Design a protein with these regions (language model features):
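Structural motif marking the loop-to-transmembrane transition
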Residues: 1-2, 57
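A structural boundary/capping signal
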Residues: 16-212
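Sec-dependent N-terminal signal peptides
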Residues: 3-12
Length: 212
């Protein structure tokens, strides 16, 4: 049992997240014509994390959601050569724009950094009634039987999924597992078919291993 506890601790330590700029990013910022704006945004981001560290859960979720949602939305096709590019939190905050995946990703890693357990956070791919394209949001769940709280770049409020009537979740995933969603609940474990490129594994490698 003692060995198991040590292994779990080491696993969690290896995959702990810390927002820390590397030399390449520092050089980019220093040479950017938007240096002042970038530094101001990053300073506010660090101040926000410090301020909310001891807040109760719902206030933490709401502050992170609100802070990120102030960043300018932009579709991949207008910002990147690759369609459906998933930016790291540092890319998102330095560039100052992104699409729904980028908001969800940065909220996820920010919440990890201030102590929210990763097993309680899930990325959810949803359909939005009246819209043709899929959308991504971040779910917070106390457990898999509870109603998710939704962090969405299209909404300033963090509210239960049952109150977001236009959202129809298809599946949800995190670093641990992935599930199909039926009738607003987790149902069965599924293996996601990412196609030619597993964007999720690639993102995790860039964040944890390459410090991008």
């Amino acid at each position: 049992m003692k060995q198991l506890i040590i292994l779990i601790f080491l696993f969690n330590f290896m995959y702990a997240y810390e927002f820390k700029l590397n030399e390449k990013e520092i050089s980019y910022i220093n040479n950017s014509s938007k240096k002042t704006f970038i530094l101001n945004r990053l300073k506010k981001y660090e101040n926000m994390k410090t301020e909310i560290k001891d807040y109760e859960l719902i206030r933490k979720l709401s502050h992170v959601n609100s802070f990120m949602n102030k960043i300018f939305p932009a579709h991949d096709i207008s910002t990147k050569a690759s369609i459906d590019y998933w930016a790291t939190p540092k890319e998102f905050l330095i560039q100052g724009h992104g699409d729904c995946e980028d908001y969800a990703i940065t909220k996820y890693f920010t919440l990890l950094e201030i102590g929210i357990p990763k097993e309680k956070l899930y990325f959810a791919v949803v359909d939005v009634k009246g819209e043709r394209s899929s959308h991504m949001v971040l779910f917070y769940l106390e457990n898999k039987k509870s109603t998710p709280l939704v962090l969405d770049n299209l909404s300033s409020k963090v509210i239960p999924l049952t109150q977001r009537e236009k959202l129809i979740p298809r599946f949800a995933f995190n670093e641990i597992d992935s599930y199909k969603f039926t009738n607003q609940k987790f149902t069965e474990k599924v293996k996601i078919n990412w196609g030619e490129e597993n964007k999720w594994e690639k993102l995790l490698n860039r964040v944890y291993s390459l410090n991008e």
